[in-house]
Curated annotation (Swiss-Prot):
Belongs to the class-I aminoacyl-tRNA synthetase family. TyrS type 2 subfamily. It is found in: Cytoplasm. Catalyzes the attachment of tyrosine to tRNA(Tyr) in a two-step reaction: tyrosine is first activated by ATP to form Tyr-AMP and then transferred to the acceptor end of tRNA(Tyr). This is Tyrosine--tRNA ligase. GO terms for cellular component: cytosol. It is an enzyme of class 6 (ligase). InterPro entries: aa-tRNA-synth_I_CS (IPR001412), aa-tRNA-synth_Ic (IPR002305), Rossmann-like_a/b/a_fold (IPR014729), S4_RNA-bd (IPR002942), S4_RNA-bd_sf (IPR036986), Tyr-tRNA-ligase (IPR002307), Tyr-tRNA-ligase_bac-type (IPR024088), Tyr-tRNA-ligase_bac_2 (IPR024108). Its main location: cytoplasm. Residues 339-400 form the S4 RNA-binding domain. A motif ('HIGH' region) lies at residues 42-51. One of its GO terms (molecular function) is ATP binding. It catalyses: tRNA(Tyr) + L-tyrosine + ATP = L-tyrosyl-tRNA(Tyr) + AMP + diphosphate + H(+).
């Protein structure tokens, strides 16, 4: 049986802040399963590793015997979360929100235990709420309090517009906790204002206020900015295993430890500390630690056999040894007249633009089947198949087909 101290150690791993820790201890002491909530607005069709920081923490609560609520903000998604934004977000259509929500449902059970998960939509209660009810909810907070939020304060100070509906978002998110009778709510550090709103509203409606647990925002592949699709520094959980492995192996050595802390189930805190000491002493190469993390992530989102195949393919390319045929085949559609090499590199996702492709070619940083190529105007047509490599770690096994 897990003790309260052991539970708190697992819950606290990677956590930025717990409000209030004494209340969490008291609720754990009752022995009753807690209702642990995290909300996700379906603003894009796929989840990435940044989203899984919260999902991983939810999974840990499940391992301790608690019930988690994966809340899909199909209603709030149409408002648009203003947290951390310097301009009003464009609301999504109902159709976009529902389409994205369906993909979320398919993806979350790669991490969460289906038996201990409630999937809920906040349109369940907001779809029934009248205009009068919404006005009553709005009366629970003041404009002055809203302007204490850093993002709103900055926009107000710089005379950037703040739409009235953006003030509603924290209230609506907070009311979700009332509707779900949440004991704990998880969120990123940028969500703290909204999470605390839930505590206040629960007290107003006669409920015990939820414990707030904030998680750090995961740095993306660049090791600097928050992981984001718009920045291109992300790993999607639906990506091919070879992409998960390749991208993970590209991250900086310092970022590896951060990712282990927030993303790994297999490497305990004690083992991570030991591995760090071995790397510092030169006993262990940091690449081996990174490879272990890459294997774990590829296995989690695919399976062990697929992960090993991806690692073998990655190893074959970076060392020039082994069977590159183990790499998954990526089809690229080309016109009947073919595609110039610079365009091919871009179409295969190996460079962000033709100009960048041309620059890489001039640097002699491009290989096809192990041979350096330099001519950006070289034409490739249907039927070509080969391994194209840009730099040391960016590669793809490509087959050209006509549309």
């Amino acid at each position: 049986m897990t003790t309260i101290e052991e539970s708190l150690a697992l819950i606290g791993r990677g956590t930025e802040e717990i409000l209030k820790l004494d209340q969490l201890q008291a609720r754990l002491a009752t022995g009753k399963p807690l209702r642990v909530k995290a909300g996700f607005d379906p603003t894009a069709p796929d989840l990435h590793l940044g989203h899984t920081v919260l999902l991983n923490k939810m999974r840990q609560f499940q391992q301790l015997g608690h019930q988690v609520i994966f809340l899909i903000g199909d209603f709030t998604g149409m408002i648009g979360d203003p947290s951390g934004k310097n301009a009003t977000r464009k609301p999504l259509s109902r159709e976009d929100v529902l389409a994205n929500a369906r993909t979320y449902e398919e993806q979350v059970f790669k991490i969460l235990d289906r038996e201990r998960t409630e999937v809920r939509f906040n349109s369940e209660w907001f779809g029934q709420m009248s205009a009068a009810d919404m006005i009553k909810l709005s009366a629970q907070h003041t404009v002055a309090r809203m302007l204490e939020r850093d993002d709103f304060a900055k926009r107000f100070g710089s005379q950037q517009p703040i739409a009235i509906h953006e003030f509603l978002y924290p209230l609506v998110q907070g009311y979700d906790s009332v509707a779900l009778k949440a004991d704990v709510e998880l969120g990123g550090t940028d969500q703290k204002f909204n999470l605390l709103m839930g505590r206040g509203l629960q007290e107003h409606y006669g409920q015990a206020p939820q414990i707030v647990l904030t998680m750090p925002l995961l740095e993306g592949l660049d090791g600097v900015a928050k992981m984001s699709k718009s920045l291109g520094n992300y790993i999607g959980i639906n990506e091919p295993a070879i992409d998960i492995v390749t991208k993970t192996m590209k991250i900086g050595d310092a970022l590896t430890w951060r990712w282990i802390d927030l993303l790994s189930f297999d490497i305990s805190m004690a083992e991570a500390a030991r591995l760090k000491e071995e790397v510092a002493s030169g006993e262990l190469h940091p690449r081996e630690v990174k490879l272990r993390l890459a294997r774990e992530l590829a296995t989690r989102f695919h399976d062990a056999a697929t992960a090993e195949q991806a690692i073998a393919g990655w190893h074959a390319v970076v060392t020039g040894q082994g069977d590159t045929g183990l790499l998954p085949l990526q089809e690229v559609v080309v016109p009947a007249e073919g595609l110039r090499l610079a365009g091919l590199l871009t179409a295969a996702g190996l460079t962000p633009s033709n100009s960048e492709a041309t620059r890489k070619l001039k640097e002699r940083a491009v290989k096809i089947d192990g041979e350096v190529v330099e001519d950006p105007g070289r034409v490739f047509t249907q039927g070509f198949e080969g391994v194209i490599q840009v730099g040391k770690r960016n590669f793809a096994r490509v087959s050209l087909v006509t549309g």
